[in-house]
Amino acid sequence: MTDLTAAARLALSLMDLTTLNDDDTDEKVTKLCHQAKSPEGNTAAICIYPRFIPLARKVLREQGTPEIRIATVTNFPHGNDDLDIALAETNAALAYGADEVDVVFPYRALMAGNEQIGFDIVKACKDACAKAGALLKVIIETGELKDPALIRKASEISIKAGADFIKTSTGKVPVNATLESAELMLQVIHDMGVGKEVGFKPAGGVRTAEEAAQYLALANRIMGDNWVDARHFRFGASSLLGNLLATLGHGEQKSSSGY
């Protein structure tokens, strides 16, 4: 097995296979569930809008993969600074049955100098998720923050407020995951000494096995060789799956979007 096939197999098992499009339908979400059960094993999770969770739960159960986790998004994709709305959306997502909630950090408020609202929103959503036994991932939108100091600050605030994962991007802005932002975020996890509790998720723009391998190598370098697993590392992606399967000898499979 080459290093690339090993990385491809690992990356597949760490994927949050995603469809977050305005034209999503029951049919598209059902297809996504089928894709998550791949010939090389299951993805870690699927990531879909909250209203599709009951359907996805049923499809995953019927196809014999109830262990595939269901993630969803809240305060998405805008990252507004209204705590009541962010919390209400998170509670609704949990009521639908989400295993994991990816909430967007109020990054524009942080850029304007308000650190407190980010902490408050993450903490409120974390408390709700903890009660429901769900994981909370916090999307800091690195491609909009841009400034390394702000990327670090958003990561630190999210972790202090209880984030289970910090995630780069919504996939809805021009610049999504980059190795540079990944390095900054992983370094914060390392420097705060929270590697046991906090994971990392690059999202958007990771489209090939080669790119995935670069992120895995970066995580190994910063966090150590045994850190990467589904509790500590995810890829938020859709088009990546087809490339991983092609790398593993299954031919090119098209996915539902370019995320």
Swiss-Prot record:
Primary subcellular site in the record, as a coarse category: cytoplasm
Compartments, record wording: Cytoplasm
Active site: D102 (proton donor/acceptor), K167 (schiff-base intermediate with acetaldehyde), K201 (proton donor/acceptor)
Pfam families: DeoC
Gene3D superfamilies: Aldolase class I
Enzyme Commission no: 4.1.2.4
Membrane listed as a keyword: no
Annotated pathway: Carbohydrate degradation; 2-deoxy-D-ribose 1-phosphate degradation; D-glyceraldehyde 3-phosphate and acetaldehyde from 2-deoxy-alpha-D-ribose 1-phosphate: step 2/2
Reaction(s) this enzyme catalyzes, per UniProt: 2-deoxy-D-ribose 5-phosphate = D-glyceraldehyde 3-phosphate + acetaldehyde
GO cellular component, one term: cytoplasm
GO BP: any one term: deoxyribonucleotide catabolic process
Keywords: Cytoplasm, Lyase, Schiff base
Any one GO molecular function term: deoxyribose-phosphate aldolase activity
Cross-referenced InterPro entries: Aldolase_TIM, DeoC, DeoC/FbaB/LacD_aldolase, DeoC_typeII
SUPFAM superfamilies (alphabetical): Aldolase (SSF51569)
PANTHER family, per the entry: DEOXYRIBOSE-PHOSPHATE ALDOLASE
Protein's job: Catalyzes a reversible aldol reaction between acetaldehyde and D-glyceraldehyde 3-phosphate to generate 2-deoxy-D-ribose 5-phosphate.
Family to which this protein belongs: Belongs to the DeoC/FbaB aldolase family. DeoC type 2 subfamily.
HAMAP family according to UniProt: DeoC_type2 (MF_00592)
Name this protein carries in UniProt: Deoxyribose-phosphate aldolase
